[in-house]
């Protein structure tokens, strides 16, 4: 009598599914954290682009501006970043718009984890950063 086992038993299959589930449960949060950190470069790039335009405007007008559309030539006063992960805007710092401008990048969509201190980014014309920038510890 030739009695060969072919295939897998239900228990073996359940063990494989459980192992895959455990690996997925460990890997997915780490993957999402990496994606969120990587998308911050999208917001940072747009903040830098707006800040460069602000500095050019300051050289000519001796003041910064919150009007990104009319004064700096952007499409709107609240700009989406290139990949849409952030919404960029400008506002006067505490000392007034003539002295300082603050560029804010507010996380959008899946980039918004519900913790603005971690998600949103800010940079003012004096070089002060707020939020959790990459490489900040």
Regions found by a protein language model. Give the residues of each.
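Periplasmic/extracellular, small/polar-rich flexible segments of pilin-like filament-forming proteins
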Residues: 59-137
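N-terminal single-pass transmembrane signal-anchor helix
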Residues: 1-31
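Residues at secondary-structure transition points
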Residues: 5, 34-41, 45, 96, ...
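Surface-exposed alpha-helical interface segments used for non-catalytic interactions
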Residues: 29, 45-48
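Conserved catalytic core of two-component sensor histidine kinases
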Residues: 17, 44, 51
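Conserved alpha-helical elements of the SDR catalytic core
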Residues: 27, 34, 54
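Alpha-helix exit/C-cap motif
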Residues: 37, 41, 49-70
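Conserved hydrophobic beta-strand within the GNAT/NAT acetyltransferase core sheet
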Residues: 10-13, 54, 105
């Amino acid at each position: 009598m030739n009695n060969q086992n072919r295939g897998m038993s239900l228990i073996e299959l359940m063990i494989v599914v459980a192992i895959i589930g455990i690996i997925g449960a460990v890997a997915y949060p780490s993957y999402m954290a990496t994606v969120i950190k990587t998308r911050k470069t999208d917001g940072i790039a747009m903040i830098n682009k707006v800040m460069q335009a602000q500095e050019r405007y300051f050289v000519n007008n001796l003041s910064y501006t919150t009007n990104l559309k009319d004064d700096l030539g952007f499409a709107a006063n609240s700009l989406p970043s290139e990949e849409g992960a952030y919404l960029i805007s400008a506002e006067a710092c505490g000392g007034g718009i003539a002295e300082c401008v603050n560029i804010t990048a507010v996380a959008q969509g899946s980039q918004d984890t519900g913790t603005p201190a971690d998600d949103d980014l800010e940079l003012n014309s004096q070089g002060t950063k707020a939020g959790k920038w990459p490489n900040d510890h």
